């Protein structure tokens, strides 16, 4: 029996794209900081001159799948990380955005064969989002770790 597992220490040579939503940037900026900290501590060059990492900003979470698809389909990246925050309001808008971004990100991964990490927080309140983006823990770190694991795993599984 063959067992395939991704490794966090095997980041050398991985090319990563990060797509971040500007809307709710108080939250998404913190997620990005946590994500970049994780990637850096695991050997990914996160400097502005990096050839391993590219960063793309989109207006909001709804736009994430479109750019994630462009990046994943480019053949330049081993993994795409998506970061966003959708916070429930008083209208059904939350439900529409959450449904579309989650389906869209999943479709990009399936269609491109490139792992796309779903790092879009969906919370009822701003407080809940902030707790997940740094007050209690920073899920951005987890999304970075997931990217490293999936990038390594995909390299180990024969096509």
From Swiss-Prot:
(2S)-2-hydroxy-3-oxobutyl phosphate binds at residues 90-91, 132. Keywords: Riboflavin biosynthesis, Transferase. GO terms for biological process: riboflavin biosynthetic process. GO terms for cellular component: cytosol; riboflavin synthase complex. Pathway: Cofactor biosynthesis; riboflavin biosynthesis; riboflavin from 2-hydroxy-3-oxobutyl phosphate and 5-amino-6-(D-ribitylamino)uracil: step 1/2. SUPFAM superfamilies: Lumazine synthase. The active site is at residue 93. CDD domains: Lumazine_synthase-I. GO terms for molecular function: 6,7-dimethyl-8-ribityllumazine synthase activity. InterPro entries: LS, LS/RS, LS/RS_sf. Catalyzes the formation of 6,7-dimethyl-8-ribityllumazine by condensation of 5-amino-6-(D-ribitylamino)uracil with 3,4-dihydroxy-2-butanone 4-phosphate. This is the penultimate step in the biosynthesis of riboflavin. NCBIfam families: lumazine-synth. This is 6,7-dimethyl-8-ribityllumazine synthase. The lineage of its organism: Bacteria, Bacillati, Cyanobacteriota, Cyanophyceae, Synechococcales. The gene is ribH.
